[in-house]
Amino acid sequence: MKIAFLFAGQYRDIPKDLIRYSIENLTKGLDYSIFCYSWDEPGESLDHREEIPKIKNDNNSFEQISNIFSAFNLKKIHTESYNNFLINLPKPHKEIFNSKFYHKGTIFALPQIYTLSKCYKLQENDASHYDLIFRCRFDSLYLHPLKLYPLRNFLNSSTLYNINFGRAYYPNRIYDIFFGGSKK
C-alpha cells in the first residue's frame, strides 16, 4: 500500500529537529511519498488574529522545506508568492477576501483551499501509484505513526478520515489540519 502525504499551506518557522521527528513518527513503517506546496513567504497563522498580519517577504520557504524534507521521500515541492496570489485573485474572490461581512474563517479558507488544490495537482501524474492520500500541515506535529490505524480498511472506504473524531467540534466540518483516505 502506497501513501501520498500532501503538505500544503503556509510554512511556519518551527524547529527543524522537531518537524523531522514528527514526520519520522507519522511515516514510520510506511511506503510513502511527500508532496509540498507553500507560499514563498513563511509566516504565522492568519486565522487567529482580528487583523491580518503583514506577510514577511523572506521568500525562503522553498529552501527551508527542502532542507527539512530532504531526509524523507520528497517527490515534489513548489512555492509561490502569496502577494501574487492576492493580486491574481478573481474579482468575486477578492470581494470575499476584502469583505468585512464574511467570517474570517471563510476569508482565510481561500488561501488554504488554493494551496491544497495545488498540492493535490503535484501528485496527479502519479495518482494511480497511491492507495491513500492524506493532507498535512507544516505546523502540525505527529506523535503517533499513521500505521497504528487500520489503513487497509480505508482502502475500500469512501469515508474521509479526519481529526474531527465523533464530530467533537462542528458536526459537518472537516478540519483542514489532517484528513485523508482512499481515492474513492
Model-derived features: positions:
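ER/Golgi luminal nucleotide-sugar-dependent glycosyltransferases, focusing on the catalytic module
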Residues: 1-184
